C-alpha cells in the first residue's frame, strides 16, 4: 500500500552460509516478475564458485546485481577476494551493491569506510557500477565525495528515513547529485511507507523526486 511498483530483493550470504538464499529470491522473482527484481549474493571464500553462481543467477534467473556486506565478512571491499566478482559484474553489465558506513550489529565499522576502501575499487574498476547503501554515515561526506568524483558510483538511502539524511546528502540530492542517489528503505527494518512519508521535508523539485524514486534505479539496474 506504499505505492511501490517494483522492489529489489537481495539474497544475504555470510561466512556461515546463506541467510537468505539465491534460490529463495529466484522463487520470489519468478512468482512475481512484475513486482520483484533479484540481487544475488555469493560465498567470498570460494571465488570461482562465486563467479559461476553470479553468472548463473544473472543469465538464467534474470538477477540484476550482486550485493555483499563487507562488515559481515570482515573484509573491506578492496580485498583481493572481491576482485574476480568485480570483473564478472562488469562483463555481465550489472552493478555491485554493498553497505557503507557503520554497522548496526556489534561488528567493526571500519570495513564500511568509503575512503580508502571503496575509492580504491572505483579506481581499479572504472567500468564497474557501484551502489553504496546505507548512505555511509558517519562518513556520508566521504560517500558524497566519491559519488561526485566517479561517474559510476551511486548512493542508495536504504536504512535511513529522509528526516535522518545528513545535510550534505540532502544538498547533493537536491542539486548536482540528483542523478546519483537511489531511494531505498531496507525493509523489513524500515517500511517504504515510512520513508515515503518523510519525503516532502527534503524539498525536492519534481525532477529530483522522479529521479530519486524511480529513474535512477531504473537506469542503474537496467529495469
Q: Which residues are covered by each model-predicted region?
A:
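Mid-to-C-terminal alpha-helical segments outside catalytic/metal-binding sites
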Residues: 1-6, 55-56, 177-182, 190-223
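Active-site gating/metal-coordination segments in enzymes
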Residues: 5-6, 13-112, 149, 163
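Conserved beta-strand positions
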Residues: 9, 68, 98, 132-133, ...
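Histidine/acidic-residue-rich catalytic or RNA/ligand-binding cores of hydrolases
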Residues: 19-20, 108-116, 140-149, 165-172, ...
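Conserved, mostly hydrophobic/aromatic
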Residues: 25, 29, 57, 66, ...
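Glycine-enriched alpha-helix->loop->beta-strand junction motifs that scaffold or abut catalytic
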Residues: 60-65, 85, 91-95, 124-128, ...
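Short acidic/histidine-rich active-site segments
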Residues: 134, 156-158, 172-193
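His/Asp/Glu-enriched short active-site or ligand-binding loop at hydrolase and phosphoryl-transfer sites
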Residues: 153-164
